[in-house]
């Protein structure tokens, strides 16, 4: 067993569950790539007939990547053989700890024809986002179209920017919903590239010293899916790097953002899930309490009246507006993503209430943008970049349509937790759906079927980090809204 379903307050769950198990067998493969052998794993029946005398080091059967997204000089390693799991099983949430919805069967693993996608204005449910997650993945790995020039490709080998919001973890999100071998392979490769550049202090060497680039989420997934234990030290070093950021807000701090706070919490949550460390367990609980205190007004340091739910701080601390107190709805998404994950190891009402209040705050940030950036013929519903205590526009640039998907997904979590707490707020659900319509229009707007003739990607992703900010945290929207089926209680009795 590599990991049970850990719980910060109910130790009994440790002995009642298995989250990740490493299984080694000897198997002579009959198929060669791109074909695959199909194996069935069963438990609870007859005892196995064979035992391996010792577990082998998974890295003993890896090789240097020499084609595609990396070449030999990049020194990226990958397994000789991948175990690809069914998407219906992966969608139960074994990786990210929350249930998602598997891709519709019509959404194949191949890149869709851009002209065909541009011609379809709307898809049922959240299928527009699912198609975009997949199609924009090909842009992210520079496989949109062979005619895209080097200057218009994502510079992920030399520049930090494409890695912001965790490029590799977003690939694992795609894998967990699609079951795509290509997504899994690129995720493992990207993780190996990233892990090789986690320096001695736990920072990403392409952005040394900047904790908003310090992640361990993808390394946890690669460890769980391949058994590669060489990632464990780097997972811990990222936690050490994040300790350099002070998440407890006060007016005296020179710097504070929701983004940095979120990645600190997430690093500790992920490392706790991997290691079970009591120090990490207690730190996660402490950070959650500190954030609740901040949301409650930071012991009177945030004045009233104010729109409830936001994590208010000054624009000078944030770096984007003046001395006034404000909060960022779209950066708050990063916080709620980490807290939803932390909820899985605590299941406490206080954390659920935090998420409900944050969903209400995000909802309060929505405005109608008269500029109609996607050419729909009507004002677009969008969240502000940052809001003041009274809900006003702190940044002064109006609605931010490019952040519609992730904000909609986390207003959806607000609805989910209102239901979990016994007082559903259907207005939150509807607002999430309304905001999703803005995102839906934007997907089509940025598909440019003829662009490759000019050296540009047909599926435009600009800046490259956009793929991560939209999709890494938005994978559970359909589940949270109960679009595919009535949403079951989160984390009840593990995953049955």
Model regions and ranges:
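Low-complexity, intrinsically disordered/propeptide-like segments
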Residues: 5, 59, 314, 493-494
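Alpha-mannosidase-like glycoside hydrolase catalytic domains involved in N-glycan trimming
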Residues: 1-55
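Short acidic, low-complexity intrinsically disordered linear motifs used
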Residues: 488-496
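Catalytic cores of extracellular degradative/oxidative enzymes
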Residues: 56-486
């Amino acid at each position: 067993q590599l990991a049970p379903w850990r719980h910060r307050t109910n130790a009994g769950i440790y002995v009642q569950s298995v989250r990740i198990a490493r299984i080694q067998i000897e198997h002579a493969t009959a198929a060669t790539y791109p074909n695959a052998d199909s194996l069935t794993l069963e438990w609870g029946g007859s005892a196995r007939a064979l035992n391996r005398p010792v577990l082998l080091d998974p890295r003993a059967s890896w090789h240097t990547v020499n084609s595609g997204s990396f070449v030999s000089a990049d020194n990226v390693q990958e397994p000789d053989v991948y175990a690809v799991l069914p998407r219906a099983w992966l969608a139960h949430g074994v990786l990210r700890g929350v249930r998602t919805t598997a891709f519709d069967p019509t959404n194949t693993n191949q890149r869709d024809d851009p002209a065909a996608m541009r011609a379809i204005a709307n898809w049922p449910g959240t299928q527009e986002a699912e198609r975009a997650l997949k199609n924009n993945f090909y842009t992210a790995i520079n496989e949109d179209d062979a005619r895209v020039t080097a200057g218009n490709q994502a510079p992920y080998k030399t520049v930090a920017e494409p890695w912001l919001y965790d490029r590799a973890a977003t690939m694992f999100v795609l894998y967990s919903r699609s079951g795509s071998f290509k997504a899994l392979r690129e995720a493992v490769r990207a993780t190996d590239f990233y892990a090789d550049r986690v320096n001695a202090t736990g920072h990403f060497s392409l952005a040394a010293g900047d904790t908003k680039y310090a992640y361990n989420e993808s390394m946890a997934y690669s460890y769980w899916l391949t058994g590669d234990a060489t990632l464990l030290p780097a997972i811990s070093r990222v936690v050490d790097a994040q300790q350099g950021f002070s998440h407890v807000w006060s007016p005296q701090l020179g710097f504070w953002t929701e983004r940095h706070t979120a990645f600190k919490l997430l690093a500790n949550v992920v490392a706790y899930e991997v290691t079970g460390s009591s120090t990490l367990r207690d730190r996660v609980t402490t950070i959650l309490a500190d954030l609740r205190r901040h949301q409650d007004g930071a012991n009177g340091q945030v004045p009233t009246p104010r729109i409830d739910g936001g994590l208010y701080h000054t624009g000078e601390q944030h770096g984007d507006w003046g001395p006034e107190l404000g909060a960022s709805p779209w950066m708050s998404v990063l916080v709620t993503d980490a807290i939803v994950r932390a909820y899985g190891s605590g299941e406490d009402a206080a954390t659920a209430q935090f998420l409900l209040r944050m969903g209400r705050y995000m909802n309060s940030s929505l405005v109608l943008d008269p500029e109609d950036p996607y050419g729909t013929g009507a004002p677009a519903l969008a969240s502000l970049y940052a809001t003041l205590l009274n809900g006003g526009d702190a940044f002064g640039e109006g609605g931010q349509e490019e952040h519609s998907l992730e904000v909609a997904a986390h207003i959806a979590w607000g609805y989910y937790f209102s239901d979990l707490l016994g007082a559903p707020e259907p207005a939150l659900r509807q607002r999430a759906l309304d905001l999703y319509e803005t995102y839906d229009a934007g997907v089509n707007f940025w598909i440019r079927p003829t662009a490759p003739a000019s050296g540009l990607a047909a599926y435009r992703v600009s800046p490259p980090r956009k793929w991560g900010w939209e999709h890494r945290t938005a994978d559970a929207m359909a589940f949270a809204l109960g679009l595919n089926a009535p949403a079951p209680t989160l984390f009840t009795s593990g995953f049955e």
